[in-house]
Each structure stands twice: as C-alpha cells, then as structure tokens.
C-alpha cells in the first residue's frame, strides 16, 4: 500500500509541475503589448512555427554498471526538459529503481524521460491495456463484435473464481468489463480468443518494442513502452479515431486509485508497480508513465 501511495503521489506532483512549467512557458511566449503615449504596438515573433508534433520517445541507454542496477545511475534522455528532470529526481529520491516518462502532447519540446534502468519489468493489471487495444483492433477489422460470445473452458477458469462457470458462454463486452476489474478468468478467455501472438503484434505496432505478453495476461513492459502506447492511442495509431476513443472511454471509467488526486479528463490504468495516464485539462493534454519498485 505504501508503494502505491508513493507512485500516486509522484504522478500528482509531476502533473502539477508539468502544468506549472507549461503555463510559465506559455506566458514567456505570449505576445507583449508595448504601451506608448499615443499608440500601442504588439511585438510579434516573426519566426514561423509548425504545428506541435509529439517527440518520438527513444529508448534510453542502460547505465554501464555491474549486474546490479544502482539507483544513483540516473539517466535523462537527450532533450529532456531539465526542470522536469530535476523535479523527477527530487520526487523519486535514490532508494528506488524507477522509470518515468512525462510528455506534453501539445508541445513536443516539453518532455522528460528519466530512469536508472531501461529493462522491462514484470507487470500485472497494466498489461491488460494491450489486450484491450487488441480487442478493439479485432472489432475494427470486423473479426469480433458486440454479439461475439466466448465459452469458458477449464483452462480459462481461475482458482476460486465464482463469477464465471466452465461451459457457459459470455458476451465479449461482459468479459472485457470483468477483465479490466481484475478477473483472471475473463482475461484468460479473451486472450485465448485473440491469441497471445496477435496481442504481442499490437503492442509492437503501438511502439512497445520491449513488451512481452504472457498467456495469463501478465508480462513485462517499461514505462517508455506504456507511454508510447497511450500516446499512440491519442494520435490514432493502430486504431482509428472511433475505436481509439472507445479504448480511452473505457480507461476513463476504470480510473485506478493511483490517479485519484488528479482532475480533468483522465484515461489511466495501473497496478502495484506501473501506472500510465493521459490527462486533458484547460485545452491541453499530457501523458505520464511511471514504474517504480522498492528495494
């Protein structure tokens, strides 16, 4: 519980800082009105600017240390906003291994990718983000729909699960809702229907190159991969706008406690060690992805 509070506190703190620095930058770039005795002029920056593009998140290089990953070997991706980097280091401290990605989705230059390890780590419920995207990709291709039903097999049934019965058929929507609430039987049935390889392929198409999905919907991923995936949804990668909106709407309903301190339009998923979210507020959007574990 203490660890979940730490990650939740980190997300709230960093989002507040991102909003603060974004507002400061916006004020600095604003047009300045010069008041003179008889007239007024507006000083404009004549340099043409292109529309914002989200900067491609690169894979940070692994610190050159021995077999142990030392928490003080913190690396920031080239181009990272130094104010954000400083704040991330301050919040994370030196006692944990961590990966943090923060990206302003309306300003490509305002981002930070900071970590002391770039390895993929075990994830729980967060891995279901990839299953959710794969489900909607199947619908987008016409291979599944609202009338699709799946019969629960003995292999699907999780020990102690009283929600689903072997041999009974359930609709995809019902299974999807149960899966997102943590039901292992539903996750197994949906994974079997789609196929682990197809889910892995969807992850790769979203840019999650270090992610590996297991048959029981656990697996390994990174904060960077999760950020790429959420940003991909926001940009309409793999899923068109209609189906990407459905995924985000689903994530808005299943808001984890880790982001309970945030306000605005929030699309998030998380577990004990990972959390990823997109927050829309005041006409802007931000993505935050975090992995942290206590030694």
Where are these regions (language model features)?
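Active-site-adjacent helix/loop patches that line small-molecule binding or acyl-intermediate pockets
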Residues: 65-84, 165-239
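A conserved catalytic-loop motif detector
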Residues: 219-268
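Active-site SXXK
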Residues: 121-150
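Short, Gly/Ser/Thr-enriched beta-strand-loop segments that form substrate-interacting elements
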Residues: 92, 253-295
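Active-site-proximal loop and beta-strand segments within enzyme catalytic domains
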Residues: 140-172
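Beta-lactamase-like hydrolase cores
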Residues: 45-119
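Short extracytoplasmic/periplasmic juxtamembrane "stem" segments immediately C-terminal to an N-terminal membrane anchor
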Residues: 33-47
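Sec-dependent N-terminal signal peptides of Gram-positive bacterial secreted proteins and lipoproteins
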Residues: 1-26
């Amino acid at each position: 519980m203490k660890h979940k509070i730490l990650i939740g506190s980190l997300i709230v703190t960093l989002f507040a800082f991102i909003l603060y620095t974004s507002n400061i930058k916006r004020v600095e770039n604003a047009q300045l009105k010069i008041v003179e005795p008889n007239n007024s002029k507006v000083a404009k920056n004549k340099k043409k600017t292109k529309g914002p593009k989200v900067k491609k998140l690169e894979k940070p290089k692994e610190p050159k240390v021995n077999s142990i990953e030392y928490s003080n070997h913190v690396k920031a991706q080239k181009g990272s906003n130094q104010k954000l980097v400083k704040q991330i280091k301050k919040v994370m401290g030196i006692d944990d291994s961590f990966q943090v990605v923060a990206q302003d989705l309306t300003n490509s230059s305002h981002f930070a990718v900071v970590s002391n390890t770039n390895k993929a780590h075990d994830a729980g419920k967060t891995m279901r983000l990839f299953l959710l995207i794969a489900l909607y990709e199947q619908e987008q291709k016409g291979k599944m729909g609202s009338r699709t039903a799946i019969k629960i097999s003995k292999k699907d049934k999780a020990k102690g699960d009283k929600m689903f019965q072997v041999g009974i058929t359930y609709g995809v929507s019902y299974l999807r809702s149960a899966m997102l609430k943590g039901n292992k039987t539903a996750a197994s049935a949906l994974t079997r229907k789609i196929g682990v390889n197809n889910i892995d392929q969807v992850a790769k198409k979203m840019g999650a190159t270090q992610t590996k999905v297991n048959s029981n919907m656990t697996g390994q991923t990174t904060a960077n991969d999760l950020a790429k995936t959420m940003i991909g949804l926001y940009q309409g990668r793999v899923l068109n706008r209609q189906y990407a909106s459905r995924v985000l709407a689903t994530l808005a309903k299943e808001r984890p406690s880790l982001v309970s301190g945030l306000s605005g339009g929030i699309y998030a998923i998380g577990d004990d060690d990972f959390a990823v979210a997109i927050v829309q507020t005041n006409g802007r959007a931000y993505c935050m992805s975090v992995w942290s574990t206590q030694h």
